[in-house]
């Protein structure tokens, strides 16, 4: 085993995975250290092929967990508090943290390979020029040392790799990017969007910009990623690799170089 590394990265979540990909593709011998357990992509910890009746209590956690104070932070986010995804989150009773009484903080963590990249919401929104200029115009803090124009090519670089499904909406407050086929709105969503457009010129209801593949590129399929089937089981892990995570995208890209340990 080679113990000489050019780069050592602590953590394999979204940031760590990206760092590993970029360093490995530039020829650096890279070591990634993860505090949590290994989670194999498409392995048994992914529950996306299990039917409701295959899950413990059909996905509802046991009442004793709440009674004994387990997963307090996660219980406040009810949509994630399910047995099919509980193992991807940290139990804050076992790993407590503190914060000032007047500044409560909900720290959602995942201690495993891929970290929170397995459970993030996948909404990918660019900052607009307004976001970079707002504090200077409002007189708060200091001006940003960079502007939107500096980041725009890097936004594009990331979007092309991860795959973002969205419309080009032409909004000043939300710049368009490198998008794949957008999801269609439901009839109810379209009805609301149309009525907002009739009554307001400065308010918009748009389809989300999600890091779920709808038209995979050759680069993405070469990594083993497939098209999203819209099953709404994302929190269980995606065996198709359709949503962006360290397991589905950046770490496989890093492994392909032969420079990752």
Model-derived regions: residue spans:
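Conserved redox-cofactor binding core of oxidoreductases
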Residues: 56-91, 96-106, 111-112, 120-126, ...
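Short, hinge-like loop/turn segments at secondary-structure boundaries
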Residues: 48-51, 224
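Glycine-rich, histidine-containing beta strand-loop boundary motifs that form or position
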Residues: 12, 34-36, 43, 122, ...
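Short glycine-/acidic-enriched loop or helix-start segments at secondary-structure transitions
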Residues: 19, 42-43, 217
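Glycine-rich FAD pyrophosphate-binding loop
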Residues: 24-46
